[in-house]
């Protein structure tokens, strides 16, 4: 059975299992779950088994191995991989294989991890349900009629279904934390700049950040240790020393920590009682473990969502302008170009983009282009940047008073597939509690925090000051030692490992 990443690594080190056995189990679980979950856009069976055989041979020969040697991992299909397609779950990039690995992928491989495949996502990471994918909808392993969240829905579902113990997602406005909450796993969005964005196909460059997803805080700490660090190829990478995150896992309590509870937005319509209950439970657990619990406010939190949905589409409009049919990706047939009323170059651009992008991507490009246009730049984009500064100031002020902030991840547990697809505003409000961390650039972690009346997972969120991932990991690990929410598995996981 595929357990947590930390358990598998111990078994590999002790010789209890071989890398070939672990990878074979992972691939078998993918095959079993793919028809109902559809977590993967590409499965690398042959190369994964070859890599596993190489790890076992090196171990037998007594060679020095990387800290993740033999561990199966899955990569969100927005991160470049030189040996398999990177499609961003879009027709625009269908079949595209990059000539290089993203830095985070290269670092995981260098640490010995074995990439078993690429995971499904909302197209170009734009969505909160993995329903905008051109590769089909992904189901939630707890209930396949529900969404796994988005945009890293496939990465979260792959862990929850037992296909891999560790996956790599990206978070622009909550895209690691929301799927982690919906799928009952742990997901970490690092500080902006802590992890390289080189090789990450950009959605919103000032917001995007890659991070690990696994069952426990211990697992995501292992992943973060391998992928974090300065990268000169990324101009936004922070040249700061990466601490050893292991001591954070040894903490037995949170004595001396002051944790501020965020309640903004909890009184709105549509907030599930299970979300409030999970937050109350987390408060109680942290108080019992020695933390001082206080109230904290972020005065401009009501502007998080509107600010995000100006800045992110503006950056997307710019970033996605490179996909034009000329150099790579989808290109409309020459016959259609010749039949168009406009000139051939304009026809190639417009028809290729119209055919290659899905409706949600087109919507955000249009919104961003409008907000950046000459008559509206100051009223929308420039104004949003000013509000973003106020939001960052709110965080700075709050962290003068507290060590961490505790709050919800999502307004509700996982909602039904197709429930919000025709209502973009309802879908955007799924980001109500998560986009603040992206706008401020601070690290945040989603922890399994409970279950609703029908057994769907509910998450809780911790946020920390810039570059204080160690603080997050310490508190999160203490919470998980004092609770068992992260140890529960969905029916799909049990079915995949019943043999």
From Swiss-Prot:
A GO molecular-function annotation: glutaminyl-tRNA synthase (glutamine-hydrolyzing) activity
Catalytic activity entry: L-glutamyl-tRNA(Gln) + L-glutamine + ATP + H2O = L-glutaminyl-tRNA(Gln) + L-glutamate + ADP + phosphate + H(+)
Plastid keyword on record: no
Protein family per UniProt: Belongs to the amidase family. GatA subfamily.
PANTHER family: GLUTAMYL-TRNA(GLN) AMIDOTRANSFERASE SUBUNIT A, TRANSAMIDASE
Task performed by this protein: Allows the formation of correctly charged Gln-tRNA(Gln) through the transamidation of misacylated Glu-tRNA(Gln) in organisms which lack glutaminyl-tRNA synthetase. The reaction takes place in the presence of glutamine and ATP through an activated gamma-phospho-Glu-tRNA(Gln).
Protein name, as recorded: Glutamyl-tRNA(Gln) amidotransferase subunit A
Native source species: Rhodopirellula baltica (strain DSM 10527 / NCIMB 13988 / SH1)
């Amino acid at each position: 059975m595929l357990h947590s990443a930390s358990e598998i690594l111990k078994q590999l080190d002790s010789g209890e299992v071989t890398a070939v056995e672990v990878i074979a189990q992972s691939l078998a679980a993918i095959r079993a779950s793919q028809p109902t979950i559809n977590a993967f856009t590409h499965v690398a069976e042959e190369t994964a088994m070859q890599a596993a055989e190489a790890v076992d041979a090196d171990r037998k020969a007594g060679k020095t191995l990387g800290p993740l040697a033999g561990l199966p991992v899955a990569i969100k299909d927005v991160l470049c991989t030189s040996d398999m397609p990177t499609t961003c779950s879009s027709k625009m990039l269908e079949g595209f294989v990059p000539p290089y690995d993203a830095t985070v992928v290269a670092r995981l491989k260098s640490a010995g991890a074995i990439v078993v495949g690429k995971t499904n996502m909302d197209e170009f990471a734009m969505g909160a349900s993995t329903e905008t994918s051109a590769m089909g909808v992904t189901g939630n392993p707890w209930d396949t009629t529900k969404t796994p969240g988005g945009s890293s829905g496939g990465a979260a579902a792959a862990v929850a279904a037992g296909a891999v113990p560790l996956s790599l997602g990206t978070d622009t406005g909550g895209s690691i934390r929301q799927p982690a909450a919906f799928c009952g796993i742990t997901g970490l969005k690092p500080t902006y700049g802590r992890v390289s964005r080189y090789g990450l196909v950009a959605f919103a460059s000032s917001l995007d950040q890659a991070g690990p997803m696994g069952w426990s805080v211990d697992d995501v700490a292992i992943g973060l240790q391998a992928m974090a660090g300065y990268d000169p190829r990324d101009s936004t990478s922070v040249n700061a020393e990466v601490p050893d995150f292991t001591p954070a896992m040894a903490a037995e309590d949170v004595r001396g920590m002051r944790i501020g509870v965020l309640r903004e937005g909890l009184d709105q319509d549509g907030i599930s009682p299970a979300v409030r209950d999970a937050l109350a439970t987390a408060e109680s657990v942290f108080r019992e473990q020695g933390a001082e619990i206080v109230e904290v406010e972020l005065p401009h939190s009501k502007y998080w969502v509107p600010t995000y949905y100006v800045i992110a589409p503006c950056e997307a409009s710019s970033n996605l302008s490179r996909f034009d049919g000329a150099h790579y990706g989808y290109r409309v047939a020459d016959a259609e170009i010749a039949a168009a009323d406009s000139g051939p170059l304009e026809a190639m651009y417009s028809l290729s983009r119209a055919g290659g992008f899905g409706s949600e991507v087109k919507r955000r490009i249009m919104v961003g282009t409008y907000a950046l246009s000459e008559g509206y730049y100051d009223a929308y984009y420039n104004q949003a940047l000013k509000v973003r500064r106020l939001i960052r100031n709110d965080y700075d002020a709050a962290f003068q008073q507290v060590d961490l902030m505790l709050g919800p991840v999502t307004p509700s547990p996982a909602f039904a597939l197709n429930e919000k697809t025709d209502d973009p505003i309802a879908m955007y409000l799924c980001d109500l509690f998560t986009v603040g961390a992206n706008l401020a650039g601070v690290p945040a972690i989603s922890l399994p925090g409970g279950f609703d009346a029908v057994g769907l997972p509910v998450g809780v969120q911790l946020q920390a000051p810039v570059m204080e991932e160690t603080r997050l990991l310490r508190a999160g690990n203490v919470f998980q030692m004092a609770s068992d929410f992260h140890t529960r598995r969905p029916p799909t996981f049990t079915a995949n490992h019943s043999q």
